[in-house]
Amino acid sequence: MLKLRKAPASYDERFMDTMASEYLDRTPWTELRLEAVRDLLDPQPGDRIVDLGCAAGAITHYLSTYGAEPVGVDLEPLAISRARELFQGLRFEVADATRLPFEDASFDKAVAADFVEHIEDDTFVAMCDELRRVLVKGGLFAIYAPNPRHLIERMKERDFVLAQNPTHIGLRDADHMRRVLEQGGFEVVRSEWRPSFFRGLRSVEKVAGPKLELFRYRVCVLAQAR
C-alpha cells in the first residue's frame, strides 16, 4: 500500500521538523528531489543561487555542498527560523517570491523544488518577472513539481484512497508550466519527467512513463530568462 507524506493546511513546527529529518536522513523521497535538482541546475562552485520556498533549508544546504553560494527564501517565518537553526552559516530570508529583497542581477540561477504547486498562475508570472530582475541575463530557473496527470495525483483529485494536499492550488502539467513560464519571460530549454520513489510503481513508471503521462510522477523544467 502506498504511504504518502500528508501535508497540513498550514506549515507548522511539526511539518518543518519532518522536512528537516527527511533531508538529514536522506529518505527516498528526498533523494529523488536532490537528484532532480542536481541534474537540472548543475550547481558549480561560486554559483549564486536563490532557493524559492526553501522551507527548512534542505535544498539550500544541498546546493552549498557543491560550493555554490545559495540563499534560501520563504514567506513563512517559522521555516526561515528553523533553516537558520539547522544550517548556520547559510543565508536565509523571509521574503515574498514576487518581491525579493535583492539587487538586480544578484543570482546566476534559481530553483523551486515542490513550490510552484502552492501558487496560482498570476503569482507564478509575477514571480517570473521578479526572477528576471534578480537573475543575470540568461540566468537559469529549475522547477521540480508534481505532475497532475500522474496516477497518484488523479487518485487524490477524486479523493480515492489518497487525499489531496489542500495547499496544492497550482498543479500544472509540462505544457501548462511552459505556457506560464513563457508568459513570465522565460524560455524552456529542457523539460522532462521523473518516476516516483515507490519501488513497485517506480518499475512500472520507467517502462510506461515514456509513452503514458499517467506514470510521470514529477515535472522537471529548466528555463532561461530572456
Give the location of each predicted region.
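Conserved N-terminal segment of class I S-adenosyl-L-methionine
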Residues: 1-103, 109-113, 125-128, 170, ...
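S-adenosyl-L-methionine-dependent methyltransferase catalytic module, highlighting the catalytic core
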Residues: 2-3, 7, 11-15, 19-31, ...
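Short catalytic micro-motifs in class I SAM-dependent methyltransferases
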Residues: 114-118
